[in-house]
C-alpha cells in the first residue's frame, strides 16, 4: 500500500498539475451503486480508511488541490428509502430504471438527511480543498415518479399526472427546470454541510454531461442546466467524452470543437469550466479499452488550440503508467523535457 501511494505521489508531482479529483467511494461491481467508501462513517461499510491519508499526502508532497469526489444519489443505503422511479409512456406503475444508475430520490427528506450524514462524516475525517459532485445527479424526462416526488410536483403547482405534464410543452419545460433546480439545491445543501465542518474555503465542482452544454434544450432529458451550474458552483466539470456519447472515432475531433464553441459563446464559461476527457473506452460488455496516450495528448492539444484553459482526464492507472506520462505531460506543462530528465 505504501509503495503504491508513493508511486501515485511521484506521478502527480511529475505531472505538475494543479488539482486531483480523488474518489472517496468504491464501486467494485462497476454498476454505479456505491456500497462502500474509503472513510469512516455512520451508514456504509468502509473498504479501507485511506482517503484521508492519500489526500493529505497528495496535498503536502505533491502540492495539489484535492477535491473529494462523491456521489449525490447512487448510494446503497437503507432499502426503505425512496428510490428514483420512472414511468414510461403507457405504463401505469412506476419502477426503477433497469439501465440507469439506481438512485435515491432527492425529494425524500430521509434521503437528504442520510446522504448529508455521509458528507459530514467525510468532512470530519479528512482535509481537502473541494467537493466534486458525481454525474449521478440527474433525472430523465420520465423521472422521478416516486411518491415523494409527485407530492413535491403538486406542491409546486404541477399536475399529479406525469403523462399530462409531458403532453403540455410549457409545463413540461417548467417541470424540467424545477427538477434541475431541486438537484442543484440538494448539492448546495450538501456543500453547506461540508463547509460547516471544514470551513467556507471549500470549493465546489459538479459533473455535467456534454449534451446539456451542446444542446441546452436537452435539460429535459437530464435535469442538468449548464447556465445554472456556472452560477451555482466554483467549477463545472464537463464530461468531454466523445466515445461515451457514441461519437465515431473519425468525428471525435469535430465533436470536441463543437463543445468548445458552445462554451465560448457564454461569458466567463471557459474560466469556470473543466473539460474531462476519457482515458478509457467503456464497453457495455465490460471489456473496456484504454485510449492511447497519443490520442489523449492529441485531444488535449485540440482543446488548447480552441481556447480551453482547464482540462483533465479520467481514469488514471498510475500503477501501469496509463496514460503514459512522457506523452501527456507536455500538454500540461511547458517545463517537460523527458529526454533530459
Ranges and model annotations:
Residues 6-13, 26-77, 86, 170-201, ...:
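Aromatic-lined substrate-binding rim segments of carbohydrate-active enzymes
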Residues 141, 200-245, 288-289:
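Substrate-binding cleft/loops of secretory-pathway carbohydrate-active enzymes
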Residues 1-2, 65-126, 161-169:
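Active-site-adjacent "subsite" loops/lids of carbohydrate-active enzymes
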Residues 230-252, 256, 262-341:
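Substrate-binding cleft of secreted/luminal carbohydrate-active enzymes
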Residues 1, 35-48, 98-116, 171-183, ...:
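The substrate-binding groove and active-site-proximal loops of carbohydrate-active enzymes
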Residues 3-30, 124-130, 229-237, 302-311:
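Catalytic domains of carbohydrate-active enzymes, especially glycoside hydrolases
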Amino acid at each position: 500500500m505504501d509503495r503504491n501511494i508513493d508511486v501515485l505521489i511521484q506521478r502527480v508531482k511529475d505531472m505538475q498539475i494543479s488539482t486531483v479529483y480523488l474518489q472517496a467511494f468504491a464501486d467494485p461491481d462497476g454498476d454505479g451503486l456505491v456500497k462502500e467508501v474509503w472513510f469512516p462513517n455512520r451508514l456504509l461499510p468502509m473498504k479501507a480508511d485511506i482517503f484521508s491519508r492519500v489526500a493529505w499526502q497528495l496535498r503536502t508532497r505533491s502540492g495539489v488541490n484535492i477535491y473529494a469526489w462523491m456521489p449525490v444519489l447512487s448510494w446503497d443505503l437503507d432499502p426503505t428509502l425512496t428510490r428514483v422511479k420512472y414511468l414510461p409512456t403507457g405504463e401505469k406503475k412506476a419502477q426503477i430504471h433497469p439501465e440507469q444508475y439506481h438512485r435515491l430520490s432527492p425529494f425524500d427528506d430521509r434521503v437528504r438527511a442520510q446522504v448529508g450524514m455521509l458528507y459530514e462524516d467525510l468532512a470530519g475525517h479528512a482535509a481537502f480543498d473541494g467537493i466534486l459532485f458525481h454525474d449521478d445527479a440527474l433525472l430523465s424526462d420520465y423521472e422521478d415518479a416516486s411518491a415523494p416526488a409527485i407530492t413535491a410536483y403538486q406542491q409546486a403547482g404541477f399536475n399529479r399526472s406525469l403523462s399530462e405534464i409531458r403532453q403540455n410543452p410549457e409545463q413540461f419545460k417548467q417541470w424540467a427546470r424545477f427538477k434541475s433546480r431541486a438537484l442543484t439545491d440538494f448539492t448546495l445543501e450538501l456543500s453547506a454541510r461540508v463547509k460547516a465542518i471544514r470551513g467556507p474555503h471549500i470549493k465546489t465542482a459538479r459533473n455535467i454531461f456534454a449534451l446539456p452544454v451542446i444542446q441546452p434544450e436537452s435539460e429535459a432529458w437530464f435535469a442538468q442546466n449548464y447556465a445554472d451550474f456556472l452560477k451555482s458552483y466554483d467549477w463545472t466539470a464537463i464530461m468531454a467524452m466523445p466515445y461515451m456519447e457514441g461519437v465515431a472515432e473519425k468525428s471525435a475531433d469535430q465533436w470536441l470543437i463543437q463543445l468548445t464553441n458552445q462554451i465560448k459563446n457564454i461569458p466567463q464559461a471557459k474560466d469556470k469550466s473543466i473539460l474531462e476527457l476519457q482515458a478509457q473506452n467503456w464497453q457495455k460488455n465490460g471489456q473496456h479499452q484504454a485510449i492511447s496516450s497519443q490520442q489523449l495528448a492529441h485531444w488535449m492539444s485540440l482543446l488548447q488550440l480552441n481556447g480551453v484553459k482547464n482540462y483533465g482526464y479520467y481514469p488514471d492507472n498510475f500503477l501501469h503508467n496509463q496514460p503514459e506520462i512522457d506523452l501527456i505531460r507536455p500538454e500540461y506543462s511547458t517545463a517537460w523535457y523527458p529526454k533530459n530528465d
